[in-house]
UniProtKB/Swiss-Prot annotation:
The lineage of its organism: Eukaryota, Discoba, Euglenozoa, Kinetoplastea, Metakinetoplastina. Its EC number is 5.3.1.1. GO terms for biological process: gluconeogenesis; glyceraldehyde-3-phosphate biosynthetic process; glycerol catabolic process; glycolytic process. It is an enzyme of class 5 (isomerase). Disulfide bonds: none annotated. Homodimer. This is Triosephosphate isomerase, glycosomal. Keywords: Gluconeogenesis, Glycolysis, Glycosome, Isomerase, Peroxisome.
Length: 250
C-alpha cells in the first residue's frame, strides 16, 4: 500500500526572535525539495505575520498553534475567524502542553477540532500518552480514548481535513524517542481503530505524524515505518536540521 502525501510540521512553540526565525525562513526558502511533501510552520501568534510575509517556498504553509472557536469578549485569545481572515488555513490543536498546562480535556480538544474543521481549517490533532500511562500498560486505552473523543464530533467527510499527530508525552523535549517499533505499534493501533470505527477508506488516507524528540538522525528510520506519515517537530524545527527531517520523508 502506498503512503499518502507526507507532512513535515514545525512546531516553534513559544520560541524564537524575529532575527533567528527570519534566518531560518530564509534557509527554508532556499531549500530544494524534490518530492511531494507538505511542510507546515506553526509559529507564535506574534510571528505569524512575519512568517506569512517572508515564507515563500511553495511547499510550505503557515499554521497556528491554538485558537478558540468564536470571536467576542475573550481577552487575550485568538479566534478561528480571526485566523481565517488573516489567511491561516492550518492549525495544531490538542498539543500535550495545552492539555497539561492549560487544562484542555479530551472534550475541549474535540470541540476545537470540530470547530476548526467546520471553519475550513486543516487540523493537526495531537494525541499521546504520558510515561506513567505507558509504563502501566495504558497506552492503547489513553490514545484511543483521545481519538474517540475527536471522532465523536466529526462526520466521516470531515476526516479529509484532519491529520493525527501521535506524540508520546514522555518523548517530548526529553531527548527520549520512541523506538521505530514503538512508533509503528502506536500508529498502527490508531489506523486500525479509524478503519474499524470510521472506515477503511478514511484510514488509508489518514496521515498520522510522529512527534517526540525527532531529529535529523532518527527521522529516516522512523519514516520507514509503514504507518508513519511524517512528523510534528519541536526543538529540531528551530534548527537547520529541520531540512534533514523534511528530506527524510522521501
Amino acid at each position: 500500500m502506498s503512503k499518502p502525501q507526507p507532512i513535515a510540521a514545525a512546531n516553534w512553540k513559544c520560541n524564537g526572535s524575529q532575527q533567528s526565525l527570519s534566518e531560518l525562513i530564509d534557509l527554508f526558502n532556499s531549500t530544494s525539495i524534490n518530492h511531494d511533501v507538505q511542510c507546515v510552520v506553526a509559529s507564535t501568534f506574534v510571528h505569524l505575520a512575519m512568517t506569512k510575509e517572508r515564507l515563500s517556498h511553495p511547499k510550505f504553509v503557515i499554521a497556528a498553534q491554538n485558537a478558540i472557536a468564536k470571536s467576542g469578549a475573550f481577552t487575550g485569545e485568538v479566534s478561528l475567524p480571526i485566523l481565517k481572515d488573516f489567511g491561516v488555513n492550518w492549525i495544531v490543536l490538542g498539543h500535550s502542553e495545552r492539555r497539561a498546562y492549560y487544562g484542555e480535556t479530551n472534550e475541549i480538544v474535540a470541540d476545537k477540532v470540530a470547530a476548526a474543521v467546520a471553519s475550513g481549517f486543516m487540523v493537526i490533532a495531537c494525541i499521546g500518552e504520558t510515561l506513567q500511562e505507558r509504563e502501566s500498560g495504558r497506552t492503547a486505552v489513553v490514545v484511543l480514548t483521545q481519538i474517540a473523543a475527536i471522532a465523536k464530533k466529526l462526520k466521516k467527510a470531515d476526516w479529509a481535513k484532519v491529520v493525527i499527530a501521535y506524540e508520546p508525552v514522555w518523548a517530548i523535549g526529553t531527548g527520549k524517542v520512541a523506538t521505530p517499533q514503538q512508533a509503528q505499534e502506536a500508529h498502527a493501533l490508531i489506523r486500525s481503530w479509524v478503519s474499524s470505527k470510521i472506515g477503511a477508506d478514511v484510514a488509508g488516507e489518514l496521515r498520522i505524524l510522529y512527534g517526540g524528540s525527532v531529529n535529523g538522525k532518527n527521522a529516516r528510520t522512523l519514516y520507514q515505518q509503514r504507518d508513519v506519515n511524517g512528523f510534528l517537530v519541536g526543538g529540531a524545527s528551530l534548527k537547520p536540521e529541520f531540512v534533514d527531517i523534511i528530506k527524510a520523508t522521501q
